[in-house]
Amino acid sequence: MSTRTARPLGPQLALAGTVGKRVDVLVIGLTSSSDGPEIALGDGIVDEAVLTGLLDTLVAVGASGKAEETTRIPAPDTLPVDSVLAVGLGSAEKLDAEQIRKSAGAAARTLSGVGTAATTLSVLDLGAAAEGFALGAYRFTEFKSAKSAPGPDAQPVARVELLVSSPRAKESKDTLARSAAIAEAVATAREFVNTPPSHLFPAEFADRAKELGTDSGLKVEVLDEKALEKNGYGGILGVGKGSSRLPRLVRLSYSAKKRNAPKVALVGKGITFDTGGISIKPAAGMENMTSDMGGAAAVVATVVLAAKLGLPVDVTATVPMAENMPSSTAQRPGDVLTQYGGTTVEVINTDAEGRLVLADAIVRACEDDPDYLIDTATLTGAQMVALGNRTPGVMGTDAFRDRVAAISQEIGENAWAMPMPAELRSDLDSKIADLANVTNHRWGGMLAAALYLKEFVADGVQWAHIDVAGPAYNSSGPWGYTGRGGTGVPVRTMISVIEDIAAHG
């Protein structure tokens, strides 16, 4: 069992009706227009005359209201704070929850060293503002020693008071509780992804997932290498056989304890480090392959979140964990393995390992007869070629694929529905086994990978595959509520889909 000490993953969030005396900074929103910026009014929480004076000062120092632009000015004597931070919201006509979320995140990133901030962004959208501040303030500093750790002036904001007209109202409290739980789940997934492979290998990942599940009241099952061998999980074992750090399969189950509750299966790729194996990757950028368990991190966080929210849906996460390494014991191009369930596969490329571990897990997940199955993985470089670093690709059964993509776009993770062209399926045929793990060409790699997984999804299951090869990890500068490193995508998509299933079946 992991002995790692938990640390706060974000600021303390609280509701407030007025700007308190202990607040250091007031954060307000600023929209842009052809006539100049305008303050997004705080529903009477801040005196309108005060806001007018603030706007005059902001215009004088060049604030424009451009999305995510931040401008900090001294506070007037009429406000009980030291300074005011205006964050751009962009065009008022185009303002939506995701822009509020991103602007709140941008504000949080600039509040280093602040003890307590209050904000009027919560009047515009309480949930989005709460999520944005919590996620924008997230930092991963676990491996900074005392000599390089951030000083007090670089610490993230410790507390954010979200101003609303009725802070004691049940609706406000429920909204904040949900948003805080979602932000914590996203941060948990980020924490897993950001932890280096020296410290998060399959056994350790399994221990941490088990600890999270146990603490959340979930049913937990962990299969070690002996159990995997006994039960015929050839994909997971094949990928993991080159590493001295042996593979695991973790299952976390949440029961709504409700008769005829919908059943949702989640599957996430958990390659704790991916060298490519014998088909080794180029050295440049390989350090980012610490993120190759981003799908697993997301599904672990999501099933725990479903339990925390008490959703009336049964949710089970099946999580294969392995390290893909080259060695004298590693699988070779040309080897044949047997996936869980009996399908034989010719391994043409050992760097197409994610689909091998996912296939085992999908077959196992389908043995529970779920109504819906969502798998997610940092699966293909082709996803980034087709859609870039911020847009997940969604494939699967048509209706459910479109439903997942629509919900993802609504909540700001912006997944895009993609096809699975039937003509690509024959390119996965093998001359010596049931399937090959890759095609013999480079075209449509993301789509072909989904077609491979489709072979293992049981008939009648509504299925969506979310490829997050780019979106799971931000290797560039921060933006909105997203810092460098793990992003937590697609936790918010998956929990929103599960909530939609709870509401509509």
Curated annotation (Swiss-Prot):
Its main location: cytoplasm. It catalyses: Release of an N-terminal amino acid, Xaa-|-Yaa-, in which Xaa is preferably Leu, but may be other amino acids including Pro although not Arg or Lys, and Yaa may be Pro. Amino acid amides and methyl esters are also readily hydrolyzed, but rates on arylamides are exceedingly low; Release of an N-terminal amino acid, preferentially leucine, but not glutamic or aspartic acids. GO terms for molecular function: manganese ion binding; metalloaminopeptidase activity. Pfam families: Peptidase_M17 (PF00883), Peptidase_M17_N (PF02789). The gene is pepA. Presumably involved in the processing and regular turnover of intracellular proteins. Catalyzes the removal of unsubstituted N-terminal amino acids from various peptides. Keywords: Aminopeptidase, Cytoplasm, Hydrolase, Manganese, Metal-binding, Protease. It is an enzyme of class 3 (hydrolase). The active site is at K281, R355. CDD domains: Peptidase_M17 (cd00433). One of its GO terms (biological process) is proteolysis. Belongs to the peptidase M17 family. This is Probable cytosol aminopeptidase. It comes from Rhodococcus opacus (strain B4). Mn(2+) 1 binds at D274, D351, E353. Mn(2+) 2 binds at K269, D274, D292, E353. Its cofactor is Mn(2+). The keyword Metal-binding applies. Its EC number is 3.4.11.1, 3.4.11.10. It is found in: Cytoplasm. Binds 2 manganese ions per subunit. InterPro entries: Leucine_aapep/pepB (IPR011356), Macro_dom-like (IPR043472), Peptidase_M17_C (IPR000819), Peptidase_M17_leu_NH2_pept (IPR023042), Peptidase_M17_N (IPR008283). One of its GO terms (cellular component) is cytoplasm.
